Amino acid sequence: MEGSWRDVLAVLVILAQLTASGSSYQIIEGPQNVTVLKDSEAHFNCTVTHGWKLLMWTLNQMVVLSLTTQGPIITNNRFTYASYNSTDSFISELIIHDVQPSDSGSVQCSLQNSHGFGSAFLSVQVMGTLNIPSNNLIVTEGEPCNVTCYAVGWTSLPDISWELEVPVSHSSYNSFLESGNFMRVLSVLDLTPLGNGTLTCVAELKDLQASKSLTVNLTVVQPPPDSIGEEGPALPTWAIILLAVAFSLLLILIIVLIIIFCCCCASRREKEESTYQNEIRKSANMRTNKADPETKLKGGKENYGYSSDEAKAAQTASLPPKSAEVSLPEKRSSSLPYQELNKHQPGPATHPRVSFDIASPQKVRNVTLV
């Protein structure tokens, strides 16, 4: 505490002396804007004419370094200096060590008893972290997969790219801010691997030409035997629509052909049935026409009990000759013929059956009255 007060008193004494003496020196060239990474060094140069007595460096309007002809006045070890003399000028360099984001701001170089000053801006960027969820990725050969890389805590936001040390049939990536978190950048790599290798996610700060990378191993395994050849490449939407329309038209055509075929079969069946019925009618008509003359010739009904004389004569001639006898059958034996006679020829009186054996048969003509 006492040392800092002594430094302040020394600066005040020097300023008082310079104010009393006066001078006509000036700043030839002031510092330039600088952008650095956190924890690195920042360098600023200020060129002045000879004859100066006191040169001061300020950061965000606070004096961090003072130089006199006798030597520097250092109040913080993070701020050091270097100087260079030439024939007509003096160059003072301010070095800021272990730069932090809080150091961002205005840096000025000024001379005592001079109205001019040189000003620049210090920008501090932070290189955050990279993260890939898995250090060893295992995927199936020939199947699409994706890998995500997260960049967190970067200011300003980095540009993310990928370096592929693996054979692929297709690869692409897209980087974007995470929704709701503007300090987090995501990059998604889509690829179809064909072999083992490594994938490297690279985040780069364009202003500083500084980058950070993260590498992961990619292991490719063969697809299961059951899944080989099951799924082919996906068809585009237009091809699917075209196939659907073609199948619909084919189905409609098949239905129409089936309907036409059924109609033709029904028509043919009706035609065949009509032809068959016509043939039956024609055959029936022909039979009717043949039967009409025979029916007209017949004048009565057919007598099924008639037998011709020739047939009776032949039957009688074949019998052996017997003597004529008259036999009266017994009552028991005559009952059956009598009953049969009653069935076939009813009559008011019954007589005993008499049979004659005639050696030479006579012709008998039977007449049936209708």
Curated annotation (Swiss-Prot):
Protein function: Provides, together with MAGI1, an adhesion machinery at tight junctions, which may regulate the permeability of kidney glomerulus and small intestinal epithelial cells. Mediates calcium-independent homophilic cell adhesion. In testis, it may function as a cell adhesion molecule rather than a tight-junction protein. It may participate in the adhesion between spermatogonia-spermatogonia, spermatogonia-Sertoli cells, and Sertoli cells-Sertoli cells.
Tissue expr: Localized to kidney glomeruli and small intestinal epithelial cells. In kidney glomeruli, it is localized at slit diaphragm. Also found in spermatogonia, gonocytes, hematopoietic stem cells and Sertoli cells.
Domain Ig-like V-type positions: 25-125, 128-215
Glycosylation: residue positions: N33, N45, N146, N196, N217
Transmembrane segments: 240-260
Keyword Glycoprotein: yes
Cytoplasmic side: 261-370
Domain of life: Eukaryota
Protein name: Immunoglobulin superfamily member 5
Compartment annotation: Apical cell membrane; Cell junction, Tight junction
Post-translational modification comment from the UniProt entry: N-glycosylated.
Phenotype when the gene is knocked out: No visible phenotype.
Gene: Igsf5
Subunit structure: Interacts with MAGI1 at tight junctions, forms a tripartite complex with NPHS1. Interacts with LNX1 isoform 2 via its PDZ 2 domain, it may also interact with other isoforms containing this domain.
InterPro entries recorded: Ig-like_dom, Ig-like_dom_sf, Ig-like_fold, Ig_sub, Immunoglobulin_dom
Topology in the lipid bilayer: Single-pass type I membrane protein
Entry's Gene Ontology cellular component terms: apical plasma membrane; bicellular tight junction; cell surface
Keyword set includes ATP-binding: no
Keywords in alphabetical order: Cell junction, Cell membrane, Disulfide bond, Glycoprotein, Immunoglobulin domain, Membrane, Repeat, Signal, Tight junction, Transmembrane, Transmembrane helix
Residue ranges of the region described as Disordered: 284-359
Family per similarity comment: Belongs to the immunoglobulin superfamily.
